[in-house]
């Protein structure tokens, strides 16, 4: 048993400890930044100094440090996170590693993401479920291309809180002037992200020495702010989750007996109360919320992030993939939209190919109609391309084979984010974030004189010259 848990159990008793732990707020954060900036070491230091490591784990780290460690005689705390053999041999992070710990104020889930450019898809996967991004910068090197890339991806995936940790301050003699120089450089860069809602905290630390990670440090006496752990404990994410209109994607129809029929899932955004008027989409049927059921009993209301079962006053047809919203909701139903897409497979994304698309609990079919541009995620400049490669990020036009109720990703990640699934291999090949939605419109049929040659020529133009913005005339044929 680790010493922190043992101490709390002795003070509170088992029941009080479990009750306190259950009602703590949860914060999900990821560590990201350039290669060798010390991301895994920082997580190891957080776990070590907050007394979250079991005795046998610490013994294993001491033993492994002598074999594959990079810190000399001291234990290599990065080995607490880098568990793959290839990671330990190369001294880098490849896969996304998850670790869990708690303090007296909050529970944490940490995603340790890789820094190398070829693992951009892994980083995007880790960021997609996080509330906060801890972005590490090597005090010797300053802001690098990979720092900019990870900041861009974290911002793209809707993370609103950045904690910029200037690491390895021990290697620059804890220089305040060097810290201020890096701070100014990052603040200047962050303005290019064009996100006025971004909350950025910047602090100095040394993960290797433990300075300003969990406790204040005499070596950084000139820094008057809080250490990293305290900053993470005080970030208010509940306000972010409560914003927005009510969205409830139905994941499961719960019918244990003939007398109960409920709809289970997690509240994606907003709040719902007993008695609220709701609409089930896509059917458009209306009803009222009769009960909000949980394992611990009924609730009068539920907020974003809570997993609940809703029962309705009326028996209406609702199935997995349907969406429950309030009757006053302003939601766009469309089959076309623009989205930022992160491509995750060796075979590049090409316009015109159909994929299974999963949005919240709903599965449909769609395709890329055009690629407007790809983003150089190091410089944030854009350039024209006809194919999106592995780890590429670009703005694309997407069309679906049916009308679906959607949000912009920045308004609701669950109903504004989606994944591409290869229809032959069933492999997830890409992820998308909806930026703009197209209103449904009645299109006049094209003249019957359109030939097969013209349809084929139109397809070639859309494939090789997507920046021209040509529409798919085959869809307009009556």
Swiss-Prot record:
<keyword id="KW-0548">Nucleotidyltransferase</keyword>
<dbReference type="InterPro" id="IPR005225">
    <property type="entry name" value="Small_GTP-bd"/>
</dbReference>
<dbReference type="InterPro" id="IPR000795">
    <property type="entry name" value="T_Tr_GTP-bd_dom"/>
</dbReference>
<dbReference type="InterPro" id="IPR044139">
    <property type="entry name" value="CysN_NoDQ_III"/>
</dbReference>
<dbReference type="GO" id="GO:0070814">
    <property type="term" value="P:hydrogen sulfide biosynthetic process"/>
</dbReference>
<dbReference type="InterPro" id="IPR004161">
    <property type="entry name" value="EFTu-like_2"/>
</dbReference>
<dbReference type="GO" id="GO:0005525">
    <property type="term" value="F:GTP binding"/>
</dbReference>
<feature type="domain" description="tr-type G">
    <location>
        <begin position="24"/>
        <end position="240"/>
    </location>
</feature>
<keyword id="KW-0808">Transferase</keyword>
<dbReference type="Pfam" id="PF00009">
    <property type="entry name" value="GTP_EFTU"/>
</dbReference>
<comment type="pathway">
    <text>Sulfur metabolism; hydrogen sulfide biosynthesis; sulfite from sulfate: step 1/3.</text>
</comment>
<feature type="region of interest" description="G3">
    <location>
        <begin position="112"/>
        <end position="115"/>
    </location>
</feature>
<protein>
    <recommendedName>
        <fullName>Sulfate adenylyltransferase subunit 1</fullName>
        <ecNumber>2.7.7.4</ecNumber>
    </recommendedName>
</protein>
<feature type="region of interest" description="G4">
    <location>
        <begin position="167"/>
        <end position="170"/>
    </location>
</feature>
<feature type="region of interest" description="G5">
    <location>
        <begin position="206"/>
        <end position="208"/>
    </location>
</feature>
<dbReference type="InterPro" id="IPR054696">
    <property type="entry name" value="GTP-eEF1A_C"/>
</dbReference>
<dbReference type="InterPro" id="IPR031157">
    <property type="entry name" value="G_TR_CS"/>
</dbReference>
<dbReference type="GO" id="GO:0003924">
    <property type="term" value="F:GTPase activity"/>
</dbReference>
<dbReference type="GO" id="GO:0004781">
    <property type="term" value="F:sulfate adenylyltransferase (ATP) activity"/>
</dbReference>
<comment type="similarity">
    <text>Belongs to the TRAFAC class translation factor GTPase superfamily. Classic translation factor GTPase family. CysN/NodQ subfamily.</text>
</comment>
<dbReference type="InterPro" id="IPR041757">
    <property type="entry name" value="CysN_GTP-bd"/>
</dbReference>
<feature type="binding site">
    <location>
        <begin position="167"/>
        <end position="170"/>
    </location>
    <ligand>
        <name>GTP</name>
    </ligand>
</feature>
<feature type="region of interest" description="G2">
    <location>
        <begin position="91"/>
        <end position="95"/>
    </location>
</feature>
<dbReference type="InterPro" id="IPR050100">
    <property type="entry name" value="TRAFAC_GTPase_members"/>
</dbReference>
<comment type="subunit">
    <text>Heterodimer composed of CysD, the smaller subunit, and CysN.</text>
</comment>
<dbReference type="GO" id="GO:0097216">
    <property type="term" value="F:guanosine tetraphosphate binding"/>
</dbReference>
<dbReference type="InterPro" id="IPR027417">
    <property type="entry name" value="P-loop_NTPase"/>
</dbReference>
<comment type="function">
    <text>With CysD forms the ATP sulfurylase (ATPS) that catalyzes the adenylation of sulfate producing adenosine 5'-phosphosulfate (APS) and diphosphate, the first enzymatic step in sulfur assimilation pathway. APS synthesis involves the formation of a high-energy phosphoric-sulfuric acid anhydride bond driven by GTP hydrolysis by CysN coupled to ATP hydrolysis by CysD.</text>
</comment>
<keyword id="KW-0547">Nucleotide-binding</keyword>
<dbReference type="Pfam" id="PF22594">
    <property type="entry name" value="GTP-eEF1A_C"/>
</dbReference>
<dbReference type="InterPro" id="IPR009001">
    <property type="entry name" value="Transl_elong_EF1A/Init_IF2_C"/>
</dbReference>
<keyword id="KW-0342">GTP-binding</keyword>
<dbReference type="InterPro" id="IPR009000">
    <property type="entry name" value="Transl_B-barrel_sf"/>
</dbReference>
<keyword id="KW-0067">ATP-binding</keyword>
<dbReference type="InterPro" id="IPR044138">
    <property type="entry name" value="CysN_II"/>
</dbReference>
<feature type="binding site">
    <location>
        <begin position="33"/>
        <end position="40"/>
    </location>
    <ligand>
        <name>GTP</name>
    </ligand>
</feature>
<dbReference type="GO" id="GO:0005524">
    <property type="term" value="F:ATP binding"/>
</dbReference>
<feature type="binding site">
    <location>
        <begin position="112"/>
        <end position="116"/>
    </location>
    <ligand>
        <name>GTP</name>
    </ligand>
</feature>
<dbReference type="InterPro" id="IPR011779">
    <property type="entry name" value="SO4_adenylTrfase_lsu"/>
</dbReference>
<feature type="region of interest" description="G1">
    <location>
        <begin position="33"/>
        <end position="40"/>
    </location>
</feature>
<dbReference type="GO" id="GO:0000103">
    <property type="term" value="P:sulfate assimilation"/>
</dbReference>
<dbReference type="Pfam" id="PF03144">
    <property type="entry name" value="GTP_EFTU_D2"/>
</dbReference>
């Amino acid at each position: 048993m680790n010493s922190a848990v043992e101490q709390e159990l002795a003070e509170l008793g088992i029941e009080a400890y479990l009750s306190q732990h259950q009602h703590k707020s949860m914060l999900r954060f990821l560590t990201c930044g350039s290669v060798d900036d010390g991301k895994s070491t920082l997580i190891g230091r957080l776990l070590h100094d907050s007394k979250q490591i079991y005795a046998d784990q610490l013994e294993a780290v001491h033993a492994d440090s002598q074999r594959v460690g990079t810190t000399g005689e001291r234990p290599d705390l990065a080995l607490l996170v880098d568990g793959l053999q290839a990671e330990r041999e190369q001294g880098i992070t490849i896969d996304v590693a998850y670790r869990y710990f708690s303090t007296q104020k909050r529970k944490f889930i940490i995603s340790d993401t890789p820094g190398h450019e070829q693992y951009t898809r892994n980083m995007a996967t880790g960021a997609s479920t996080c509330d906060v991004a801890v972005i590490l910068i090597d005090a010797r090197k300053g802001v690098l291309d990979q720092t900019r890339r990870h900041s861009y991806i974290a911002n793209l995936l809707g993370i609103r809180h950045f904690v910029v940790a200037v690491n390895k301050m021990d290697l620059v003699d804890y220089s305040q002037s060097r810290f201020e120089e890096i701070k100014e450089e990052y603040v200047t860069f962050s303005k290019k992200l064009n996100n006025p809602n971004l909350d950025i905290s910047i602090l100095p630390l040394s993960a290797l020495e433990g300075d300003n990670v969990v406790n204040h440090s005499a070596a950084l006496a000139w820094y008057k702010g809080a250490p990293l752990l305290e900053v993470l404990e005080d970030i208010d994410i509940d306000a972010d989750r409560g914003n927005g209109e009510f969205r409830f994607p139905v994941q499961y129809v719960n019918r244990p007996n003939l007398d109960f029929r409920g709809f289970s899932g997690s509240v994606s955004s907003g709040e719902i109360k007993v008695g609220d008027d709701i609409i089930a989409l896509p059917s458009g049927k209306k009803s009222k919320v009769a009960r909000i059921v949980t394992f611990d009993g009924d609730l009068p209301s539920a907020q974003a992030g809570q997993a609940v079962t809703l029962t309705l006053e009326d028996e209406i047809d609702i199935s997995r993939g349907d969406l429950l919203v309030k009757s006053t909701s302003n939601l766009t139903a469309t089959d076309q939209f623009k989205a930022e897409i992160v491509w995750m497979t060796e075979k590049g994304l090409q316009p015109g190919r159909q994929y299974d698309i999963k949005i919240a609990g709903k599965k449909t079919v769609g395709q890329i109609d055009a690629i407007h541009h790809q983003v150089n995620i190091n410089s944030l400049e854009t350039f024209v391309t006809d194919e999106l490669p592995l780890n590429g990020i670009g703005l694309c036009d997407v069309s679906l084979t049916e009308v679906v109720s959607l949000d912009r990703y920045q308004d609701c990640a669950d109903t504004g984010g989606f994944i591409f699934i290869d229809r032959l291999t069933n492999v997830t090949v890409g992820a998308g974030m909806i930026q703009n939605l197209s209103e449904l419109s009645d299109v006049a049929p094209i003249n019957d004189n359109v030939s097969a040659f013209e349809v084929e020529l139109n397809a070639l133009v859309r494939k090789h010259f997507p920046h021209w913005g040509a529409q798919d005339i085959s869809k307009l044929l009556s």
